[in-house]
């Protein structure tokens, strides 16, 4: 009898949570993560511990990246970001470089003479791909809803937070 009530309670709870129309609110506890971003700041990320600061692609190799925990380059700037003048910056950066919504593989950005046009497709179809001190990484989305996008950003922020902790 107790098992029946126990099962019914959890089935009801599961249905109640599954049918919610509430806005996704994923609360994570991170230290402050500061990201230099080339492109638009994501409007879905509103937490106070995630700080974005707009930067210009042309200024990447002129700037000291120390104030940032990572640099993000959004889809509209990927073709230009694959120019060989930036390759050494990505390879030598002391912080992770993240490319958002790239249709191409990471090699477009980190291998000299590869460009966005002549590099093969991103077969993994990761939403975020990146490079950090000899390591490439990717974060995929589980779907194409705002909730999936927010969860993808949080997976990326978790990764960046771990990299930050490892580097300190």
Q: What name fits each language-model region?
A:
Residues 1-5:
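Positively charged n-region of N-terminal signal peptides that target proteins for export
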Residues 37-38, 71-75, 98-101:
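Conserved beta-strand segments of the P-loop GTPase G domain that flank and frequently precede/overlap
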């Amino acid at each position: 009898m107790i098992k029946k009530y126990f099962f019914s309670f959890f089935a009801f709870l599961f249905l109640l949570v599954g049918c919610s129309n509430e806005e996704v609110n994923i609360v994570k506890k991170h230290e402050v993560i500061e990201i230099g971003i080339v492109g638009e700041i994501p409007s879905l990320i509103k937490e106070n511990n995630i700080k974005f600061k707009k930067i210009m692609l042309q200024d990447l190799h002129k700037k000291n990246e120390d104030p940032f925990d990572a640099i993000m380059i959004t889809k509209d700037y990927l073709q230009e970001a694959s120019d060989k003048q930036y390759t050494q910056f990505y390879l030598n950066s002391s912080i992770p470089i993240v490319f958002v919504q790239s249709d191409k593989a990471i090699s477009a950005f980190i291998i000299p003479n590869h460009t966005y046009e002549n590099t093969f497709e991103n077969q993994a179809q990761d939403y975020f791909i990146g490079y950090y001190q000899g390591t490439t990484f990717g974060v995929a989305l589980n779907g194409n809803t705002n909730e999936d996008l927010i969860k993808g950003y949080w997976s990326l922020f978790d990764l960046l937070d771990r990299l930050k902790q490892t580097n300190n």
